[in-house]
């Protein structure tokens, strides 16, 4: 009886280095991608991509015809991110950078590369900062990455004022902004949050070529106007006449809370203080303080 064989392993580093040398190497390549808005050519090897990734197996499933095959156009993925994907597929390792990791994460999700996705998520959590967090939140909401969304919301809750001043905040979708405005733990006063929401809506209105109030409609209902002092509410009402942002009915409800001096009349959240809410004289009448 023939004895059982034994699998022995050589050194992984030379093998990985040899495969890494094939990334975007036209020598022996049999497929060319045209990548990103810059339409940069990237060279690869069909058999390797197909055996490592179902997305490429489907994309490259048909045999190339005679002659020079046509390039495969992938216009939505940035070149740097695509090269990182190839590096991972060839070597099962990848060098990630803070400035491009969200693009690599997006590609990993779209191509169904779960291991690369997890590596990117771990890296994002390690490098998360004020400038990156809103962009990361947008990616998390777009692709349903629940744990990353929770991490981002918690980070913004702790660094609210700084995060609200970033470009990433102004570029959030309404769906990504909603979990922030619903949070009791934001370390920011409501007056500043109203100003941030207005700035966000103005940017969206300019990009989408729609009225500010229309852009703001999905999110402004989460603003807790009853927390504002009467003078602040009057000023907001006047500004709202000049540049509509908040439905008149919502402002009326805030005035009702002042008139009745009972927080429960606002039915919960509209009168509930956030962690960063500055104290005002009328808050002593509100039943629902921050917990």
UniProtKB/Swiss-Prot annotation:
Residues 134-234 form the BACK domain. InterPro entries: BACK (IPR011705), BTB/POZ_dom (IPR000210), BTBD19 (IPR042846), SKP1/BTB/POZ_sf (IPR011333). It holds the Pfam family BTB. Residues 29-98 form the BTB domain. It comes from the Eukaryota. Disulfide bonds: none annotated. This is BTB/POZ domain-containing protein 19. It comes from Homo sapiens.
């Amino acid at each position: 009886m023939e004895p059982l064989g034994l699998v022995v392993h050589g050194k992984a580093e030379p093998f990985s280095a040899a495969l890494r040398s094939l990334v975007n190497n036209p020598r022996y390549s049999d497929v060319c991608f045209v990548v990103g808005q810059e339409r940069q050519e990237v060279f690869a090897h069909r058999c390797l991509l197909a055996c490592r990734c179902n997305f490429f197996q489907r994309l490259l499933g048909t045999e190339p015809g005679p002659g020079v095959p046509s390039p495969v156009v992938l216009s939505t993925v940035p070149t740097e991110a695509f090269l990182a994907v190839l590096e991972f597929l060839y070597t099962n390792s990848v060098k990630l950078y803070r400035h491009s990791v969200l693009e690599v994460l997006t590609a990993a999700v779209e191509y169904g590369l779960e291991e690369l996705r997890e590596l990117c998520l771990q890296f994002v959590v390690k490098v998360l900062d004020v400038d990156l967090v809103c962009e990361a939140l947008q990616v998390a909401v777009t692709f349903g990455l629940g744990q990353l969304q929770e991490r981002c919301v918690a980070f913004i809750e702790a660094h609210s004022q700084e995060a609200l001043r970033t470009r990433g905040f102004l570029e959030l979708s309404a769906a990504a902004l909603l979990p922030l405005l619903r949070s009791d733990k934001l370390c920011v006063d409501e007056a500043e949050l109203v100003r941030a929401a207005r700035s966000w809506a103005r940017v969206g209105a300019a990009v989408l070529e729609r009225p500010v109030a229309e852009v703001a409609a999905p999110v402004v209902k989460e603003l807790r106007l009853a927390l504002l002092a009467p003078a602040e509410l009057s000023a907001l009402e006047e500004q709202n006449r000049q540049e509509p942002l908040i439905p008149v009915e919502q402002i009326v409800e805030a005035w009702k809370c002042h008139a009745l001096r009972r927080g429960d009349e606002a039915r919960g959240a509209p009168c509930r203080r956030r962690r960063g809410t500055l104290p005002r004289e009328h808050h002593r009448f509100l039943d629902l303080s921050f917990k």
